[in-house]
Regions:
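Surface loop/turn signatures of beta-propeller and other carbohydrate-active proteins
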Residues: 1-35, 54-57, 71-98
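Beta-propeller blade signature
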Residues: 64-67
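Conserved small/polar residues in nucleotide/adenosyl-binding loops
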Residues: 112-117
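Short glycine/acidic-enriched loop and turn motifs that connect beta-strands
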Residues: 52-55, 110-111
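Entry beta-strands of beta-propeller and related beta-repeat scaffolds
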Residues: 43-46, 102-105
Length: 122
């Protein structure tokens, strides 16, 4: 799922001439809530909900951009894509923290079930 999103962006990215100068924008698709705004290894990281395949809402992925000056942002590969049964609707709001020297992402997922005994709800 991650590679599919990254490949789509490589083929359908928005040209830099069409983007604002000082605002974070996705390389392709639709952008929503900022998440995981953090400093890691001396750089500022911004993760955000987005759907890379259309300019409308879809199963949320997490985009990722990095800056050193809060003006020039570098797009990184898609950080998260909904690729599990429990997050197939999307990877929603969350945070980024440093733990044991690693950048750890925490997010919200949503699972609907009619089976109250479903193990994935425990």
């Amino acid at each position: 799922m991650l590679e599919k999103a990254n490949e789509y962006i490589r083929q359908n990215y928005i040209d830099e001439k069409e983007k604002p100068l000082f605002h974070v924008t996705p390389e392709a698709g639709w952008m929503n809530d900022p998440n995981g705004f953090s400093v890691y290894q001396g750089k500022v990281h911004l993760f955000y909900q987005f759907y890379p395949y259309k300019t409308e809402w879809g199963p949320m992925h997490w985009g990722h951009q990095v800056t050193e000056d809060l003006l020039k942002w570098e797009a990184y590969p898609v950080a998260m894509a909904p690729d599990q049964d429990y997050d197939h609707i999307g990877c929603f709001s969350g945070s980024a923290v440093e733990a044991d020297g690693k950048h750890v992402l925490l997010y919200t997922c949503l699972l609907y079930t009619s089976d109250a005994a479903d193990d994935s709800l425990r």
